[in-house]
């Protein structure tokens, strides 16, 4: 049973931001944000035609700065949020230096400007052109197509809170609630007036020694979407969005910086985390003294971990060892004994076989290691339309689309 070959798409700029178009459940579509210091940055809308195994694309200009994080509305296909760098420079006048002398004053201004220019990571909500919400039929090498621009809906004002790390949407919501992490602040926003206005509804701050900063966060799809998990330094924390109070804390979750985390979509107390200690850990938030399971398959920092939205035993990780690993964590999944069918559907002969099968949990294992990348893999994510397909993005701008091996797919389904 031969598997389909991976499909590779190359961006002309470096990139680290990737998201599926979450509200799109029919077409396979991903959004990729670039990081260029010299040129206008872009968002590439990537459509994957799985029948013909080809990629179609459209390009949107993102002129405000290099993109560090991108996320898509769960309710509106045309709405997305980005975190991006903006540089604020100090402007001084020669006249203010009086008798210092023109050449000395110019040197002073040059030094002051270079040292006082401030880079702030901001966040904004955007709308793509209406005709691009549902995809494209252009080929990847169609250079005649002109890039279109995004419509700015609103800024998330972070002038009082610091650098934005990420923006996450309420997973089951109407696209009106988002959370942003800015330095040591967690900020809950209400989007009003068709997302053209962001009102800060509530906030909380990390308290402690040193300069505490959030690195990532995820909104739990469970508990009526009232819980968010965050990572800062080596610590994982859970928050109740109704009171913005801390509900659990996993100190020293990793030996080094925690890079990412994700919730199991089918088991409400389970989450996965990854970090600079090269490990992926799985946690039960009811008992945080030690992880339920630990994976040590990567040889460098693990930047991303993602549960499959439908089959939670499938876990994707991406690392700066340039590899993507697909693991089968069936023993801690919602179906540890495999796919079980109703007794009424089993014949006597099949009954004996199913009893044999269900005596002990299936074994966890690495399904596949994907090595199509040649640079650090900063993002991996599952398609929101096809549970057997995923994308990975490396810093050199290479986007790779892969599928779960057919043999495993049929094993899970049958």
Swiss-Prot record:
Main location class: Golgi
PROSITE patterns documented for this protein: WD_REPEATS_1 (PS00678), WD_REPEATS_2 (PS50082), WD_REPEATS_REGION (PS50294)
Chain positions found as Phosphoserine: 347
First and last residues of every WD repeat: 159-199, 209-249, 253-293, 297-337, 372-412
One of the protein's GO biological processes: positive regulation of retrograde transport, endosome to Golgi
Gene Ontology CC terms: EARP complex; GARP complex; trans-Golgi network
N-acetylmethionine PTM positions: 1
Keyword Acyltransferase: no
Function: Acts as a component of endosomal retrieval machinery that is involved in protein transport from early endosomes to either recycling endosomes or the trans-Golgi network. Mediates the recruitment of Golgi-associated retrograde protein (GARP) complex to the trans-Golgi network and controls early endosome-to-Golgi transport of internalized protein. Promotes the recycling of internalized transferrin receptor (TFRC) to the plasma membrane through interaction with endosome-associated recycling protein (EARP) complex.
Similarity remark: Belongs to the WD repeat EIPR1 family.
Subunit structure: Interacts with two multisubunit tethering complexes: EARP composed of VPS50, VPS51, VPS52 and VPS53 subunits and GARP complex composed of VPS51, VPS52, VPS53 and VPS54 subunits. Interacts with SNAP29.
Name this protein carries in UniProt: EARP and GARP complex-interacting protein 1
UniProt source species: Pongo abelii
Lineage: Eukaryota, Metazoa, Chordata, Craniata, Vertebrata
The encoding gene: EIPR1
């Amino acid at each position: 049973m031969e598997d389909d070959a991976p499909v590779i798409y190359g961006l002309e700029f470096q990139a680290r931001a990737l998201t599926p178009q979450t509200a799109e459940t029919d077409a396979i579509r991903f959004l990729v944000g670039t990081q260029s210091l010299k040129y206008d940055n872009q968002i590439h809308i990537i459509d994957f035609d799985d029948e013909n195994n080809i990629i179609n694309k459209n390009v949107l200009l993102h002129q405000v700065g290099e993109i560090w994080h991108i996320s898509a509305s769960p309710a509106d296909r045309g709405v997305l949020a980005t975190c991006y760098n903006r540089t604020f420079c100090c402007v001084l006048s020669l006249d203010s230096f009086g008798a210092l002398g023109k050449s000395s004053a110019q040197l002073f201004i040059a030094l002051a400007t270079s040292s006082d220019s401030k880079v702030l990571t901001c966040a904004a909500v955007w709308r793509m052109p209406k005709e691009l919400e549902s995809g494209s039929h252009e080929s990847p090498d169609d250079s005649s197509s002109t890039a279109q621009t995004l419509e700015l809906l609103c800024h998330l004002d972070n002038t009082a809170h610091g650098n934005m790390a990420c923006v996450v949407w309420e997973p089951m919501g109407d696209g009106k609630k988002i959370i942003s992490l800015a330095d040591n602040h967690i900020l809950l926003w209400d989007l009003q007036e068709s997302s053209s206005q962001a009102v800060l509804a509530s906030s909380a701050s990390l308290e402690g020694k040193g300069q505490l900063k959030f690195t990532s966060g995820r909104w739990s799809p469970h508990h009526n979407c009232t819980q968010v998990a965050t990572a800062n330094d080596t610590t994982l924390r859970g928050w109740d969005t109704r009171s913005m109070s801390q509900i659990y804390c996993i100190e020293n979750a990793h030996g080094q910086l925690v890079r990412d985390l994700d919730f199991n979509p089918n088991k409400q107390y389970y989450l996965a985390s990854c970090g600079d200690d090269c490990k992926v850990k799985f946690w039960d938030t009811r008992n945080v003294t030690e992880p339920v399971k630990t994976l040590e398959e990567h040889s460098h920092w693990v930047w991303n971990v993602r549960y499959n939205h439908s089959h939670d035993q499938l876990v994707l990780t991406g690392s700066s060892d340039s590899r993507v690993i697909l693991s089968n964590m069936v023993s801690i999944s919602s179906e540890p004994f495999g796919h079980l069918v109703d007794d009424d559907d089993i014949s006597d002969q099949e009954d004996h076989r199913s009893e044999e099968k269900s005596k002990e949990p299936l074994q966890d294992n690495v399904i596949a290691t994907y090595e199509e990348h040649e640079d650090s893999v900063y993002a991996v994510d599952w398609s929101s339309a096809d549970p057997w397909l995923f994308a990975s993005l490396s810093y050199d701008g290479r986007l790779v689309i892969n599928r779960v091996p057919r043999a495993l797919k049929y094993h899970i389904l049958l």
